[in-house]
């Protein structure tokens, strides 16, 4: 693994803690949080409290939702700043929660095999240098019969596919015509450098993920 690249990714997200946490906090106050909560709950057939790993937990959005349901949460993130933020957010939103947070690389977990009933992740795998290794680790720590739920997207595929670039531009134009502000994706020098180096930037998903699993 390129340790320098991993540290660059950590530094980038550590620098975005306050802004990203604010976005998550706003989302918790909208119908979108209920949609996420019910979507996940539909995939979990068990009624008893579950041991859940929130991989790449960030400021703790999924951890808060699952803690509210009484599950035992373990959140990991490579950014220590994100971990501290997640701890604080869970304490504020769900003070009675059973939640533990640890700074850890989601591609190299230190947990024993078959530790968790559920592995959750959102908007993480596109950041990873070795997403295939992350999937292998998540399956390793997932008990037999457990559930893996990963929510991610083709965030940057349009930068490498002309047809997707055309559709992206059309969508942006439509949104601007409707009065919405569309931010220029470029401009952050760290991401501009990292995106071409990350393997999932050029992959079509979820096709790649299904093949990997």
Protein language model features and the residues they cover:
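A short glycine-rich, Lys/Arg-flanked "PGG" loop and its adjoining helix->strand segment in the class I
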Residues: 132-144
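A short SAM/SAH-binding and catalytic strip from SAM-dependent methyltransferases
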Residues: 118-131
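Class I SAM-dependent methyltransferase SAM/SAH-binding core
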Residues: 53-55, 59-108
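A short acidic, Gly/Pro-enriched loop at the edge of an enzyme's catalytic core
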Residues: 107-118
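Short N-terminal helix/helix-N-cap motif within the alpha/beta-hydrolase-1
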Residues: 81, 128-133, 158
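Conserved class I S-adenosyl-L-methionine
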Residues: 1-48, 61-65, 147-187
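Short alpha-helix
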Residues: 200-213
